């Protein structure tokens, strides 16, 4: 298929730069713009060297070019604080917004759990939750699709070197958004999320712990089978997603211990937390793009809200 859907990325930091590398390999997506606010940023320089158009004037520098350059999908890898305004401007021009910040103004999307239902929903903004959410929510969902989960708790441990300034400013949003998605997408009645930023040298690979309390005695065989099935689904787009231990059963508690190794596109392989986020965003965009190219999905501009 030679035809591709054109994309723009807002935020040339760790996540935006890693995502750009993944989009360049995509059979259905073509990145054409990288948007930043600092003309001297490494991310913008790198994008220019790759032949990508750049602007250091923020999203307003992109808007006049969207129609001419045929941009239909925009990724926001900036901060929760500016996302709503970015999304509004992009949606008004008829482009789909894929949100990699914890802003969560659109529906949560965790590809192996609920991506299919978003494709026909007419949503013009989908939120990729957080790196911790992408790594752990599939496992909560794997348990909850077998039997009711009263409580789900996730702990994401990431290397300090892989956590950029945007993520550090959004720690509270990270925990709130992830906990909310553990409930809404994972299916737990109550969710909790904890992030640990580890300064150890050499840097540690991303590790995730998932605890689920089931309402009834856990069906160990069915839950184990469900977890391994879900593991295989995530590995389709994140090959370094591994089950280190578990599921471990202790009364009604089901525990799963995971490790996520990145592909090493931009950041080293220990930054699996960024890799799972960018891989999930690319996978989501590809599914939307395939529908658009097949004529099954047409994007429509979102009318501005009257003041």
From Swiss-Prot:
Enzyme Commission code(s) on record: 1.2.1.10
Entry superkingdom: Bacteria
InterPro entries (alphabetical): Acetaldehyde_dehydrogenase, Acetylaldehyde_DH_C, NAD(P)-bd_dom_sf, Semialdehyde_DH_NAD-bd
Ranges annotated as spanning the membrane: none
GO biological process: catabolic process
Single GO term (MF): NAD binding
Keywords from the UniProt entry: Aromatic hydrocarbons catabolism, NAD, Oxidoreductase
List of catalytic residues: 131
Known catalytic reactions: acetaldehyde + NAD(+) + CoA = acetyl-CoA + NADH + H(+)
Protein name: Acetaldehyde dehydrogenase 2
């Amino acid at each position: 298929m030679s035809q591709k859907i054109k994309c723009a990325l807002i935020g040339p930091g760790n996540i935006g730069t890693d995502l750009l590398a993944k989009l360049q390999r995509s059979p259905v997506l073509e990145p054409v713009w990288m948007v930043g606010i600092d003309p001297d940023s490494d991310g913008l320089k790198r994008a220019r060297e790759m032949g990508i158009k750049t602007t250091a004037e923020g999203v307003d520098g992109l808007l006049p070019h969207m129609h001419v350059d045929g941009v239909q999908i925009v990724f926001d890898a900036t901060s929760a604080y500016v996302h709503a305004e970015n999304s509004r401007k992009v949606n008004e021009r008829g482009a789909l917004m894929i949100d990699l910040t914890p802003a969560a103004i659109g529906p949560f999307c965790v590809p192996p759990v609920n991506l299919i239902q978003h494709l026909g929903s007419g949503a013009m903004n989908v939120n990729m939750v957080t790196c911790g959410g992408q790594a752990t929510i599939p496992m909560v969902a794997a348990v909850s699709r077998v039997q009711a989960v009263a409580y789900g708790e996730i702990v994401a441990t990431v290397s300090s070197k892989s956590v950029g300034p945007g993520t550090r400013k959004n720690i509270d949003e990270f925990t709130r958004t992830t906990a909310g998605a553990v409930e809404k997408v994972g299916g737990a009645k109550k969710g909790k999320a904890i992030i640990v930023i580890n300064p150890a040298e050499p840097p540690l690979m991303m590790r995730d712990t998932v605890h689920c309390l089931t309402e009834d005695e856990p069906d160990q065989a069915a839950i184990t089978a469900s977890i391994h099935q879900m593991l295989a689904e995530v590995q389709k787009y994140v090959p370094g997603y591994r089950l280190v231990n578990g599921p471990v059963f202790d009364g009604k508690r089901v525990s799963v211990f995971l490790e996520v190794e990145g592909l090493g596109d931009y950041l080293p392989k220990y930054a699996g937390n960024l890799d799972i986020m960018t891989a999930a965003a690319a996978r989501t965009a590809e599914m939307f793009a395939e529908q658009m190219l097949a004529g099954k999905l047409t994007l429509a501009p979102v009318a501005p809200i009257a003041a």
